[in-house]
Amino acid sequence: MFDWAWADAYQRNGVPYYPKLLCAVPFTPVQGTRVLAADDDARRRLAATLLALAEQSDVSSLHVLFPTETEAQLFDSMGMMLRQGVQFHWINDGYRHFDDFLGTLEQKKRKNIRAERRKVHDAGVTFRRLTGDAIRDADWRFFSRCYRQTYRDHYSSPYLNLEFFRTIGQTMPDNLLLVIAEADGKPIASALAVYQRDPGGGGTLYGRYWGAVEHVPCLHFETAYYQLLEFCIEAGLDTFEGGAQGEHKLARGFLPTVTHSAHWLAHPAFSDAVSRFLERETNHIHAYVDELHDHNPFKRGAE
């Protein structure tokens, strides 16, 4: 939920946008509970206290990112403005293996995926899928190198460092999947995902970061998508959240999913302007999602 345009508008009009209050999981665009409460009454009280804190503080705004739909409705009832976004999620429809999944796609999409995987295989690339204690420090060092390279490729600065990845490797090893691509006996690319298993079975995998130090055609799709899809099928996970941006995910079996955020702006004029903008944007989001569903890659009747 990017608000750079809002911050820019504030700056151009000589109004400070920072500091602002943010309720979110850092660096993690994943929908989940943002108001931690024992019951609905406590949740309402806590949400109201959060809004009151914003109103009484010297901040420009309050932003709650990726709450559950129920929480979004709660913030809406309190007068906050709702914003919608689109992510792409893959759903495991009880697939037994990757070809089982491919069989649900239209012929052209199925053929394209097989061609992409073949290019990587023919280039001599092999893969290691590592979880838990199997992830060594050398693997973290290489992944961190790939992570930094991705940011350099996009002329940006990385937020996380090697020590962060080492730390999560120690504190939550059973929730991490690290894919290492190798060619000629050396690593050339990697992808990191986080997953959680539900108590009753199933679970969700969240794609996070990917990077490469050598170019191989279609390596991104194989490392960051197809290897993770195979893991989901083998592990019995229900969902693979591929994140935002990239209609290319649609052609690979990821369907659009609407996400939510809630916003309060202290400045009356800006609040009114953003409210009108969000009304128009929401209409565009709904039309966009409908169009994406019309072009989904599955055989008709197989969604």
Where are these regions (language model features)?
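N-acyltransferase acceptor-side catalytic subdomain
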Residues: 1-303
